Design a protein with these regions (language model features):
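Charged, low-complexity intrinsically disordered segments and flexible loops
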Residues: 1-4, 17, 46-56, 67, ...
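A short, structured beta-strand/loop element
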Residues: 25, 29-57
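Short, compact, well-ordered microdomains
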Residues: 60-109
Length: 109
């Protein structure tokens, strides 16, 4: 069962659990990831705070697809095996670079 009825970006069109507690979500206009409390524990607090800024008041469980989602990909490298149609080793390396260049840089300022 989907643990949410709405997202920060509107009503979900697609919501699929791709790993325990990790949901990929798409709406008509945007998307990202939703993490339950157990999955969220794998995300560093600073990355959760960064993601919460883009969740439009929906809290730290939402990671928008443009930048914040990279924190999820880095924290869950097993998504390469669980979802090879969405992720590969290059996806994880790209996500690490984005976390380093954007998220970590912004939270350190």
């Amino acid at each position: 069962m989907i643990p949410f009825k709405n997202t920060p970006w509107g009503k979900p069109i697609i919501a699929q659990e791709i790993a325990p507690g990790v949901w990929v979500v798409a709406t008509a206009s945007h998307g990202g990831f939703y993490l339950n409390t157990d999955a969220l524990a794998r995300i560093p607090d600073a990355h959760q705070a960064y993601a919460a800024r883009w969740s439009h008041g929906h809290g730290p469980n939402w990671f928008e697809e443009d930048v914040a989602a990279c924190a999820v990909i880095v924290a869950f490298p097993e998504l390469i095996v669980a979802c090879p149609e969405l992720f590969d080793a290059e996806s994880v390396e790209d996500a690490r670079a984005i976390v380093r260049c954007y998220i970590d840089r912004e939270i350190s300022q």
